[in-house]
């Protein structure tokens, strides 16, 4: 570094990239590198793969370098494509409709700068994939959405038309014997607050109006679902106590997917009015502040990111209005830690109580977090 006058590791990386690029160019090859190669200065003829969002691709295109857009969201196919995945994924949520909607030419670029975007690429990383069938599951049918997204002029893209044709494409997968994902048929579930803060609402939606929804409640959460003991869904279901609910989407009386289940664990704070004095990180917004009191405890691991709120560079302060004076015997706060993903648990947690919402008294503070086997 001293002999080359390099100030830091970024300039060292740039030196290496430029040197190896000259070698590759001499062999008639082109260097393609992840967007980290922007750090310290870009090699003259390098093509940039923009994976950490779109910022790297935008910067490279403005410098008149060719770019392949491959942002983790929505083009990492090892991310979940269902909110009800039955196996562990690396995290993230990239459903097929999100893939189809992606535009590889960022709006921040001028028409001339946009010409440097060669296209887009989807990636499948195999840390959580143990066999070829699982690879097929991650690829199909999202590959169809990727292909049409890239090959169709922007003005002709039509999700509704694509959706109508998707069942025929799925028949092809079946003819091939491909292990395609049926996540497209999954119900979309959302837990919402009630108007009077009594319990929560469980909202179910299908991808298409042609599909109907049926559901039932499992009195014993250990019992298996019973598709014959069901009710037809016509509006969000009000939940007022702990229990497990099962839902199916149907067409012409036949179930289209595996059942989707939701377990609710109620306490005094469930469904109550909650206010955050600091905003959650845009990378981990969950379903907003209500995520903390919606009665849902994440048992699916990090892939269920909508059940997490993340905070970056600021304390998390939540004010929960219980509505009436309540006797509190204990407070449990669930946190998540995964250092490999740069997610850290809080330094400490402090609980305050108030009778009027103005004067607060510290009730307890701890920095002793007990590891849970749930997540």
PLM feature spans:
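Aromatic, loop-rich ligand-recognition surfaces of beta-strand-rich domains
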Residues: 300-375
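Short, compositionally stereotyped local motifs that mark structural "simplifiers"
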Residues: 164-318, 336
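Acidic/polar loop patches that form or flank catalytic/metal-binding clefts of enzymes
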Residues: 25-35, 60, 67-71, 153-159, ...
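Flexible loop/turn segments at secondary-structure boundaries
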Residues: 38-43, 55-57, 74-79, 126-131, ...
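Hydrophobic alpha-helical scaffolding
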Residues: 6-14, 46-50, 129-136, 156-159
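Active-site neighborhood of glycoside hydrolase catalytic domains
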Residues: 1-44, 51-59
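Substrate-binding clefts and catalytic carboxylate motifs of secreted carbohydrate-active enzymes
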Residues: 81-82, 86-201, 207-211
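Substrate-binding cleft/loops of secretory-pathway carbohydrate-active enzymes
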Residues: 32-69, 74-91
